[in-house]
């Protein structure tokens, strides 16, 4: 009985998301679960060139849009 209870606790911990992660798009199809609570997309000349976790700095030619909800960088 203790083994069953321990197994249920472990499965619950692994399945629950305690709000410390966010799911970000890497491409149109693929996503990644990130520890950082921020997603970004880099845009240049009206084309999205990169997506991922975190919030990198912008430059004159590259605009970066950062957001903080699941799959918000689409």
From Swiss-Prot:
One Gene Ontology cellular component: extracellular region
Chief site of localization: secreted
UniProt GO molecular function: toxin activity
Keyword Membrane found: no
Gene3D superfamilies: CD59
Organism of this sequence: Micrurus altirostris (Uruguayan coral snake)
Tissue specificity remark: Expressed by the venom gland.
Disulphide bridges, residue numbers: 24-39, 34-53, 55-66, 67-72
A Pfam family this chain is assigned to: Toxin_cobra-type
UniProt protein name: Three-finger toxin MALT0065C
Compartments where found: Secreted
TM annotation in the entry: none
InterPro entries (UniProt xref): Snake_toxin-like_sf, Snake_toxin_con_site, Toxin_cobra-type
Coiled coil (UniProt feature): none
Signal peptide feature range: 1-21
UniProtKB keywords: Disulfide bond, Secreted, Signal, Toxin
Family: Belongs to the three-finger toxin family. Short-chain subfamily.
């Amino acid at each position: 009985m203790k083994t069953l209870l321990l197994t249920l606790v472990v499965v619950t911990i692994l399945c629950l998301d305690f709000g410390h992660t966010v799911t970000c798009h890497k491409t149109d199809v693929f996503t990644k679960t990130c520890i950082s609570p921020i997603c970004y997309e880099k845009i240049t000349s009206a084309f999205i060139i990169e997506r991922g976790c975190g919030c990198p700095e912008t430059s004159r030619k590259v605009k970066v849009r950062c957001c903080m909800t699941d799959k918000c960088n689409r």
